[in-house]
Amino acid sequence: MDKSKRPFLKSKRSFRRRLPPIQSGDRIDYRNMSLISRFISEQGKILSRRVNRLTLKQQRLITIAIKQARILSSLPFLNNEKQFERTESTARTTGLRTRNK
C-alpha cells in the first residue's frame, strides 16, 4: 500500500511499564512512615489516586493509614513550612504616634 493512502497511521513506540509505587512486600500501615510520606503532598494533603497510580484498594488503605498517623500525632494535619522559618521581630522605631487633627 502506498504511503499517501494512509496518512494518519502513527508509528508504534515502545514504552516501558512503570514500576508500581507499592511493592508486594510493603506493608501499608500507619507506622510505616517512609511509605506513607511518598503519598502526601508538600502541604500535607493526601495525593489523589490518579497521581499516585494506586489501585482503589491500595488508595483506601493508604488514606486510612495517613489518617491514623495524623490522629496519633505521627504526621501533622497541616504541613506549614512558615512555622519552621525564623521570623525576624521588627523593632518599633517610631515612638508614640501623634494624631493629626
Curated annotation (Swiss-Prot):
This is Small ribosomal subunit protein bS18c. NCBIfam families: S18 (TIGR00165). It comes from Vitis vinifera. It is found in: Plastid, Chloroplast. PANTHER family: 30S RIBOSOMAL PROTEIN S18, SMALL RIBOSOMAL SUBUNIT PROTEIN BS18M. SUPFAM superfamilies: Ribosomal protein S18. Its main location: plastid. Keywords: Chloroplast, Plastid, Ribonucleoprotein, Ribosomal protein, RNA-binding, rRNA-binding. The gene is rps18. Part of the 30S ribosomal subunit. Gene3D superfamilies: Ribosomal protein S18. GO terms for biological process: translation. GO terms for cellular component: chloroplast; mitochondrial small ribosomal subunit. Belongs to the bacterial ribosomal protein bS18 family. It comes from the Eukaryota. The keyword Cell cycle does not apply. Pfam families: Ribosomal_S18. One of its GO terms (molecular function) is structural constituent of ribosome. HAMAP family: Ribosomal_bS18.
